[in-house]
């Protein structure tokens, strides 16, 4: 029974890139982005709940987020949750709406965020290389078990390497785009 599964390897590599893109979307640039509030949890009804389950988040202006709280009793809890999340945002309450103006990023903070984007990319590339290693080990095991020939193994190793190169390049381009976005705001 062959262990090597090209589709699984490609799926796992694509998953690493998607995870990177998700992580990068949470980095704050100068523009308002609703995904910035994804990690915020709010204590309501005696339980911790994600912000998106107690309110609607939108970006009415390029530098402002608005959180429309569904239950008026939860407004202060939402405000507290946003403050606790340490996002560097200063919530202002206006009835059932919590407004979050996006402060300007300092040059130092921009560099920190760009560096963080690079770290996220490196983690994704490590994950991709780990998937490649697993694929190569599976191919060697298949060859040892006489499921494939040496020529097949080498051909398939080239395929795995090409997939690796493709997804590493994708990770790099996603990180570069985010770094550029951060530095040019």
Curated annotation (Swiss-Prot):
Cellular compartments annotated: Cytoplasm
UniProt-listed Pfam families: RRF (PF01765)
Origin: domain of life: Bacteria
Disordered as annotated region, ranges: 137-159
GO molecular function: ribosomal large subunit binding
Keyword hit for Protein biosynthesis: yes
InterPro entries listed in its UniProt record: Ribosome_recyc_fac, Ribosome_recyc_fac_dom, RRF_sf
Gene Ontology CC: one annotated term: cytosol
CDD domains reported for this sequence: RRF
GO terms classed as biological process: cytoplasmic translational termination
Keyword Cytoplasm listed: yes
Alphabetical keyword list: Cytoplasm, Protein biosynthesis
Protein task: Responsible for the release of ribosomes from messenger RNA at the termination of protein biosynthesis. May increase the efficiency of translation by recycling ribosomes from one round of translation to another.
Family of this protein: Belongs to the RRF family.
Protein name in the entry: Ribosome-recycling factor
Species this protein is from: Erythrobacter litoralis (strain HTCC2594)
Gene, per the UniProt record: frr
